Curated annotation (Swiss-Prot):
Its EC number is 1.2.4.2. Keywords: Glycolysis, Oxidoreductase, Thiamine pyrophosphate. This is 2-oxoglutarate dehydrogenase E1 component. HAMAP family: SucA_OdhA. The keyword Coiled coil does not apply. NCBIfam families: 2oxo_dh_E1, PRK09404.1, PRK12270.1.
Length: 932
């Protein structure tokens, strides 16, 4: 590996933040070379003898003797670092800055005459051939750094990136738009503004979350997509909240005006869906508000055929960011091959649009940005655009953040930040150009802060002057960017005044024509909102059978390693035991081996697998060992990359210490590539609630709201084992509360073979109408439990079973105990010590959909049954009890007694003391097995 950070010898020329210090050290060196470190002695000796470092030093020795050069360089340094504080980036209501660093020539006891006597090369080496002297160069820098784009990049640690940005920003450049392009740009703005005005006039008070004040967002997106087309990027993934969303849908994804206006009129918009199939819009049966909806457009409008997707989004601001990143990575990965996927960052790019209040306020943004350079998550650079209207509902910046800009928090991720005046549309285009060039060069994120305002209230029913009267006095006086740019083109002679007004009127005419096509009487009235017939049934078992030899061949391959690969002896001993199910009569397949065999057969079927989570390569409980490490060299080997007849990729990554962003990423990946078996594994199930927004707003409701299918699988370690309230419960009750309309499968298993068949069933459902999320309350101590491990013949045939029982004599059973997961195993082991034929244990393997028919059939076979008990280790107000009670109550009816055994109602999930845990657990088991 190479270290991207440059040696200190490059610091004085390129490290703006350290320039003052380096100059002081250089002065010390001139007085006494031994007073500075040896590496700086070498550097300063080079400067002293080589004009290429500071080209003008020799010719300015007289000025340098009185500190002139040092003052010049400090002025330059300040302009680069702090010029943004005086930049012309505010269309209205510029902030009053306090304590602005020195940025003027006179602040450094300099003047025009002095600067004209100094070479331009002292300002920057690339200025030497452009400007006659330092004065001209500094004027250029002042104009550049204090203009309509404010640049922040001196915080970036990478020397090459910072140097590239400095040259790109300071080299004379202007967006060159010919007259036709300027006219086209004005038309874009006319459509953007005209659309909002039409809706405002014709649907008074209707919520639309207008784009007005940051209208330039649309041409910025159009410019971005056009550049991407030229670079061969054919998949664009966009994520944004509600502000300006309707405008982006109509003018970037080309959603017809008729469809949009239909939604305001509550008529059926799908009647106006383009018949050529170029626009894909899915809908759920309960639906969502119009400003949450997304779509996919296939178009050549931007220069080549591209697929442009705007992700569906809830009102939870910013939560869509990791979803978009995941969708992008899925579009970049080639998964239809053996081994690991190959990733091509030129296939797709993400654009994420943020709000200025939500960007620094929501932690999901920083979880997501942290993924940017990680092997398992990088998308080759995201374009972040902040639609900065400088207010959040009623909250002004002084109450919204502790930093100068909403973007300051992005500095920790070593990305450039450009603030641009939203009313200077040509400057916004230039900002996009530089951002896209940087992304292409370095495959890193860029943040553009589009500084504008909000024309109306948070929504169009809100009166902003109640809480923000002074800013809105000025906002109401501010002309729209459409008008500002139009007048500029009139003054330049690009268009006439009549043409400007004609463009504006044409937009209104087109909107009126679209409006007139809609039949007001054609109202949508479907109160039943039934789910699709495909979801009437639970996840179907995969009945494919395997020969003993087939599974043995797979197992042998998984336990074969490259010559010279040195596995830790302790681990090698554990792995060798995985041969036993195939060469010993009493050999059993434990949980981890069952998973490996399932994964291998799924890969042979052509379904790619992607598994991520904290410590997932090894497994939190040291059970999986999917990635092996050579104990001498540290090199890695992944056996699931070498499965015989493998037709798809296996991708596994240890995730960063994040839940929300990582789960959102995997959800997005699976939505984009529905053939991919995506699995997120929590370190402990207790930590899954950090992803609750993803669960609530995407995973469990996306199909109902948006018609968006997902088959994401969650592995959530869950069991009460005396480890305290934060390492016991995956909050099973919350997933069961979210379960409805066959929107998911929730299981808590007690058998390794059932786990094998479950994984295969889930994989088989992918990319079908039956696909749905799978939630596995995965084991901890049961990973190595011999009661859970099963012989190989349970793997060669059969399928997933929603309930499991042991053999029993029907007429002797008087009590049925229903339990799940580890509770079932604890009961089974206790009953084995004191057998009682009157008690029948039933493992409820699948909790949702609840196996009513299977239980009803079982109970009907027991003529002397008197009591049915539900036993769980969770408190009564948690776990599955409150969910299963209505089902079991119906099954029991008046025929049998119904009882509950488990912890009493508790605020916390579990006891903190391990010994107390044992007492409580044993008491539950003892009471449950009593036969009254």
């Amino acid at each position: 590996m190479t270290n991207e950070r440059k040696e200190v010898s490059e610091a004085p020329v390129n490290f703006g933040a350290n320039l003052g210090l380096m100059l002081d050290l250089y002065d010390d060196f001139l007085q006494d070379p031994s007073s500075v470190p040896e590496d700086l002695q070498v550097l300063f000796s080079t400067i002293k003898n080589d004009d290429s470092i500071v080209p003008s030093l020799k010719s300015t020795s007289s000025q340098n003797s009185d500190g002139t050069i040092k003052r010049v360089m400090r002025l330059i340094d300040n302009i680069r670092q702090y010029g943004h504080l005086k930049a012309d980036i505010y269309p209205v209501n510029p902030p009053k800055r306090k304590h602005v660093p020195k940025l003027e020539i006179e602040d450094f006891d300099l003047d025009q005459q002095t600067l004209e006597g100094i070479s331009a090369g002292i300002v920057s080496d690339h200025f030497a051939d452009i400007y006659d002297n330092a004065y001209e160069a500094i004027l250029r820098m002042e104009k550049r750094y204090k203009g309509p784009i404010a640049f922040e990049y001196t915080h970036i640690n990478n020397n090459t990136e910072r140097g590239w940005l400095k040259r790109r920003i300071e080299t004379p450049y202007k967006v060159t738009l010919n007259n036709n392009e300027k006219r086209a740009l004005f038309k874009q703005l006319a459509y953007v503004e005209g659309f909002e005005k039409y809706l405002h006039k014709n649907f008074v008070g209707a919520k639309r979350f207008s784009i007005e004040g940051v209208d330039a967002l649309v041409p910025m997106l159009q410019r971005t997509i056009t550049i991407a087309a030229k670079e061969g990027i054919k998949n664009i993934q966009i994520g944004m909240a509600h502000r300006g969303r309707l405008n982006v849908l109509t003018h970037v994804l080309e959603k017809p005006y008729e469809m949009m206006i239909s939604e305001f009129m509550h008529t059926d918009p799908m009647k106006f869906l383009p018949e050529d199939g170029s626009l894909q819009l899915t809908a759920g049966w309960t639906g969502d508000v119009k400003y949450h909806l997304g779509g996919i457009k296939t178009t050549d409008s931007y220069g080549t055929m591209q697929r442009i997707a705007l992700a569906n989004n809830p009102s939870h601001l910013e939560i869509v960011a990791p979803v978009v990143e995941g969708r992008t990575r899925a579009a970049q990965d080639d998964t239809q091959r053996a081994g690991a996927p190959t990733t091509d960052h030129h296939k797709a790019m993400p654009i994420i649009i943020h709000g200025d209040g939500a960007y620094p306020g929501q932690g999901i943004n920083f979880e997501t940005m942290n993924l940017g350079n990680l092997k398992g998550y990088s998308t080759g650079g995201s374009l972040h655009i902040i639609t900065n209207n400088r207010i959040g509902f009623t909250t002004e910046p002084i109450d919204a953040r502790s930093t100068t800009y909403s973007t300051d928090v992005a500095k920790g991720y070593d990305v450039p930040i450009f603030h641009v005046n939203a009313d200077d549309v040509e400057a916004t285009i230039e900002a996009i150009d530089i951002a896209m060039e940087f992304r292409k060069e370095f495959h890193k994120d860029v943040v553009i802060d589009l500084v504008g305002y909000r024309r109306f209230g948070h929504n169009e029913m809100d009166e902003p002057s109640i809480t923000n009267p002074v800013p809105y006095q000025n906002i109401r006086k501010n002309d729209s960017v459409e008008y500002v740019f139009g007048k500029k083109l009139v003054n330049e002679g690009v268009i006439s005044e009549d043409e400007m007004h004609s463009f504006i009127e044409q937009v209104q005419k087109e909107l009126r024509q679209a409006h007139d096509k809609i039949n007001k009487a054609d109202k949508m009235d479907n109160p039943d909102m039934e789910k699709p017939a495909e979801l009437a049934l639970p996840l179907q078992a995969d009945e494919q059978s395997f020969t003993f030899d087939h599974l043995k061949e797979i197992n042998d391959a998984l336990l074969t390693y490259p010559d010279g690969f040195n596995i830790l002896k302790k681990l090698n001993k554990v792995l060798k035991k995985r041969h036993e199910p195939f060469n010993k009569e009493d050999g059993l397949v434990d949980w981890a081996q069952a998973e490996q065999l399932a994964f291998a057969t799924i890969l042979q079927d052509g379904t790619p697998i992607r598994l991520t989570g904290q410590d997932s390569e090894r497994g939190t409980f040291s059970h999986r060992h999917a990635v092996l490490h050579d104990e001498q060299t540290g090199e890695t080997y992944t056996p699931l990359h070498h499965v015989p007849n493998q037709k798809a990729t296996f991708d596994i990554h240890n995730s960063p210490l994040s839940e929300a962003a990582v789960v959102g990423f995997e959800y997005g990946y699976n939505v984009e590539n529905k053939k991919s078996f995506n699995i997120w594994e929590a370190q402990y199930g207790d930590f899954a609630n950090m992803s609750q927004m993803i669960f609530d707003n995407f995973l469990f409701s996306s199909r109902s709201k948006w018609g968006e299918r997902s088959g994401l699988t969650l592995f959530l370690p869950h069991a009460y084992e005396g480890q305290g309230p934060e390492h016991s419960s995956a909050r099973l009750e919350r997933f069961l509360q979210l379960a409805a309309e066959n929107n998911c499968t929730v299981v808590n298993l007690s058998s390794s073979s059932n786990y094998f068949h479950l994984l295969r069933a889930q994989a088989a459902s992918l990319d079908s109408e039956q696909m749905r999320p799978l939630v596995v309350m995965s084991p901890k101590s049961l990973l190595r439990n011999k009661t859970v491990a099963k012989p190989i013949d349970e793997f060669t045939s059969g399928g997933f079973e929603p309930i499991l029982t042991e053999s029993y004599q029907a007429d002797k059973v008087t009590k049925v105990i229903l339990a799940t997961g580890k509770m079932f195993i604890d009961l089974k082991e206790a009953l084995a010590k004191n057998p009682d034929e009157s008690v029948l244990l039933v493992a409820i393997e699948r909790l949702y959909p609840f196996p009513e028919e299977e239980i009803e059939t079982l109970l009907a076979q027991l003529p002397n049954l008197e009591e049915v008990s539900w036993v769980q280790e969770e408190p009564k107000n948690q776990g599955a009890w409150l969910y299963v009670y209505p089902y079991v109550k119906v099954l029991v009816a008046d025929k049998y007694d119904l009882s509950y055994h488990g912890r009493i109602q508790r605020a916390a999930p579990a006891e903190g003391d391990g010994e107390i845990h044992k007492l409580v657990q044993n008491k539950i088991i003892e009471n449950a097995l009593k036969n009254n």
